[in-house]
Amino acid sequence: MPSGIGLLNLRVVLFDSDIYALQALNSYLAWDRRTRVMFMTPNIHEFWEYLRITLAAELPDIVVLDADHLGGATGLRNTLRRIQDLSPHTGIVCMVQSLQEPELAQVAAEEGAKAFLLKNEVRLRIAWAICATVEHDMIVTSEVQRATHDISNRRLYNAFILPEQRDYPEMTDRIRQAIRLCVIEGMPAHLAADEMGISLHTIRGYIKEGYRILEANDHYEYPTDMTPQERAFMRFTALADER
């Protein structure tokens, strides 16, 4: 089975000042049985209050943290330390919109964060990245690795580079679009057909062919109660080396 399916059940808390990014993260994680979003907020005060009042047994396994808007390197360091004080066993995944401040990655590494990811790189792979933190000391995306190669930090130097999303060469752009709309975004077929300017019959054909391609390139067995749509989501978002 794919890494951790049936084994992992990670409690996740999301903080991102961008409400649209927050909703996207929640949506992608909701599709993956290995991750369970317990709380999300764009408000840092609500974030602290949640950690403060939550029972120790119910504290998150993972916090996904918008590291761009915390007051630079000093603000990030203070935030990471406070999270660790409130929830010592929680892994922290830092995400940034840009790499204009590579020193943020250094701070994340020094303070024990489990990942430092560029949002535009990780995209649909966020659940896979979170689950990979269980197996690796630290994870970065490839652009983060390039931007920090001259920073002297053992954890950054040895960090696991998140693989690219699995490629499906057989999948045409139109089939890929249909899969994205109906599987990733969860859009009903008739609305997706209207969005693409095609008939309902045609989009159903695209989805059927997309499912066939996804299954042909995947060798895992899945829990019997997983729907075809769940399997398709897992396969479409899988990492290149997860076969």
Language-model segment annotations:
Residues E58-I62, L76-T79, R174, E195, ...:
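Glycine-rich, flexible loop segments associated with nucleotide phosphate handling
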Residues I151-L156:
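Terminal C-lobe "cap" of eukaryotic-type protein kinase domains
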Residues M1-D150:
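N-terminal regulatory/sensing modules of transcriptional regulators
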Residues A113, I198, A216:
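Short glycine/serine/threonine/alanine-rich loop segments
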Residues K208-R243:
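Basic, Lys/Arg-enriched C-terminal extension of HTH/homeodomain DNA-binding domains
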Residues E135-S142, L162-Q165, I207, I213, ...:
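Short, structured secondary-structure boundary patches
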Residues N158-R204, K208:
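Helix-turn-helix DNA-binding segment
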